[in-house]
A protein has these predicted regions:
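Peripheral, non-catalytic segments flanking oxidoreductase cores
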Residues: 1-365
Length: 365
């Protein structure tokens, strides 16, 4: 299986032939596989390893020492997410065996935060964060975001659209960078069907993955303990392979991975499909895995519906009705267990009790 690799310097080139080469790679990658390998991406891999070291130091702290950095009241959209919190929408209800840390790599948009405060909260940092924790996560997020913008411009050209269409939609969006550490299984848990993260698709526009690493039972970086554990991505179904194919998410040397999210699928009417992916656990106890992801979102005021170019009757049936991206985000965060069900009460008219209060107060109309 030949998943295309795109060179970001092709997409930013002044030479039309190079730009078209990059766009053609994205057309095939996102249209057939839902993901692409990216080289010359600008992510500092040495800094990434240094950040992973810092994050491992944080995760190793007792749970009580980390609780002040976890905020359920903002739906864990910033700061620490404790283990057994998030679930996959299309999974079997098993909470993920992981700890996470969320941060927005850019300053919060104040106007958007007034409308969707839980999607645009301020960053939270441990008061005694390990060295390079904050700087490392923010620098990683910004590097991945810049690479993502270039990919979105290339994806627009690949679809015959003005190059800025997708990039413009995500200006001031609720972008977030997440560090993850998948936790060790005990001897009684391995080979029992437990997954580090159940199969799911991301609900955002585009996800950038800089690559992860395993930690052995002594907490040291090491090659994976077997050939079955780690990130796997499911390709689009074909007549020959109706279930698609699970491919290992390890990219060629020096590359990162970008995968399509639900928002990009909706905007393209299914021309690009969101990438299902699963994180499998090793068959031996004591191992952990570290990874990171940057989630690019369209702005919360964007209407999620196929763009005019893709608005066929079939696409309308598949993706109607149109929905505000901020509403979509809230609904999904409830579905995956990060936001409480009561968050859905925000999505409709909230003043039905006004007449009752008037009646109780003796008002006459």
């Amino acid at each position: 299986m030949n998943i295309p690799t795109v060179d970001l310097t092709d997409l930013s080139s002044n030479e039309p032939a190079r730009v078209e080469r990059g766009a053609a790679a994205l057309r095939e990658a996102f249209g057939v596989f839902g993901l692409v390998y990216v080289k010359n991406h600008g992510v500092d891999t040495q800094a990434l390893q240094r950040f992973y070291d810092s994050f491992a130091t944080f995760v190793a702290r007792p749970l009580e020492a980390k609780r002040s950095s976890g905020r359920a009241e903002i739906w864990y959209q910033r700061g620490w997410t404790p283990p057994n919190t998030e679930v996959a929408v299309a999974g079997n209800g098993q909470p993920d065996f992981k700890e996470c840390y969320f941060a927005a790599p850019y300053p919060t948009d104040e106007a958007s935060a007034l409308e969707f405060p839980n999607l645009y909260p301020e960053n939270i940092w441990p008061p005694d964060a390990p060295p390079f924790f904050q700087e490392g996560l923010l620098t990683l997020g910004r590097s991945l975001h810049e690479a993502g913008l270039e990919l979105l411009r290339g994806a627009a050209l690949a679809m015959g659209l003005p190059h800025s269409v997708f990039a413009d939609l995500c200006q001031r969006g609720p972008h977030v960078t997440r560090a993850l550490q998948y936790l060790p299984l005990s001897g009684s848990q391995v080979n029992t069907g437990i997954l580090w993260g159940e199969e799911h698709t991301d609900f955002n526009l585009l996800t950038l993955l800089p690559g992860g690493r395993f930690l052995n039972p002594q907490g040291q970086p090491a090659p994976g303990p077997d050939d079955k554990s780690g990130l796997y991505l499911r390709t689009r179904s074909t007549p020959e392979e109706p279930q698609g194919r699970l491919v290992r998410g390890s990219s060629p040397s020096g590359c990162i991975v970008a995968q399509v999210g639900q928002q990009l699928e909706i905007l393209t009417g299914g021309t690009f499909l969101a990438t299902p992916h699963v994180i499998t656990a090793p068959g031996v106890p004591g191992w952990q895995r570290q990874s990171a992801a940057h989630f690019m979102h369209v702005h919360t005021s964007t209407v999620l519906f196929p763009l005019a170019r893709f608005r066929t009757p079939e696409a309308v049936r598949n993706y109607a009705p149109p929905v505000l991206a901020g509403t979509y985000d809230i609904k999904t965060l409830v579905d995956i267990g990060l936001a409480p069900p009561s968050a859905l009460d925000q999505l409709g008219y909230r003043h039905y009790d006004r007449l009752n209060r008037q009646r109780a107060g003796g008002s006459k109309v």
